[in-house]
Amino acid sequence: MSGHSKWATTKHKKAANDAKRGKEFAKLIKNIEVAARTGGGDPSANPTLDDMIKKAKKASVPNDNIERARKRGSGEEAGGADWETVTYEGYGNGGVAILIECLTDNRNRAATDVRTAMNKNGGNMADAGSVAYMFNRKGVVQLPKEGNTEDDILMAVLDAGAEEVNDLGQNFEVVSAAGDLSAVRDALKEAGLEYDSAEPDYRADVKVQLDASGARKIFHLIDALEDSDDVQNVYTNMDLSDEVLAELDN
């Protein structure tokens, strides 16, 4: 169950400049609203809400914004939007498969934003189901390396449904079936192991190897997609070698 990959998750992490930071805050706030609406506004009784609040705090979202989002979602305060999750599918440069996960209160706006970003940046929309079958829904928990060892994590999650524990360089991740995410999270808590995030994720069965030029085109497309306020997550099946990663870092 042990592995190492600098690119184990193909969900692109955006640069923390001011404009993107503001958009990231908005996405985290939406996650809190939805979690509170789905499972109630008490973080101690709603692990998903608790995780979303912790993630927002780690990203330096102001506490007042977090609390208002929690109250809107739970109905304690008016103004919550009717968010729905919509997933779009497509292809990027080099035949890279792309899943675009939106959380929106306007399906037509989300579809237009996604289609425009794809068309202007070398992507193509695909029919429903033509890309999604290449991905599996997983549960992914990320833990800091500081204070944790791979052996400790393995011992904690072996009987909780974990499929892999990966060393990502600066942190560890535990991968499970999506339905086992809660059990893995609970097992880590019982073992006294602190984690940074615990969320559903999509992982591709078959990866597409790209060179640095191809990777830059995909990253440019992902940035364009994530400029939409409705786009929450972008997943791809691209795979980058250590050599390509080193070239991208230069």
From Swiss-Prot:
InterPro entries reported in the protein's UniProt record: Integrase-like_N (IPR017856), TACO1_YebC-like_2nd/3rd_dom (IPR048300), TACO1_YebC_N (IPR049083), Transcrip_reg_TACO1-like (IPR002876), Transcrip_reg_TACO1-like_dom3 (IPR026564), YebC-like (IPR029072)
GO biological process: regulation of DNA-templated transcription
Localization: Cytoplasm
Keywords tagged on the record: Cytoplasm, DNA-binding, Transcription, Transcription regulation
Major localisation: cytoplasm
Domain of life where this protein originates: Bacteria
Gene3D superfamilies listed in its UniProt record: 1.10.10.200, 3.30.70.980
GO MF, one example: DNA binding
Coiled coil: none
Gene Ontology cellular component annotations, sorted alphabetically: cytosol
Region of interest (Disordered), residue spans: 1-22
One Pfam family recorded for the sequence: Transcrip_reg
Family: Belongs to the TACO1 family.
Record-given protein name: Probable transcriptional regulatory protein ckrop_1032
Taxonomic source organism: Corynebacterium kroppenstedtii (strain DSM 44385 / JCM 11950 / CIP 105744 / CCUG 35717)
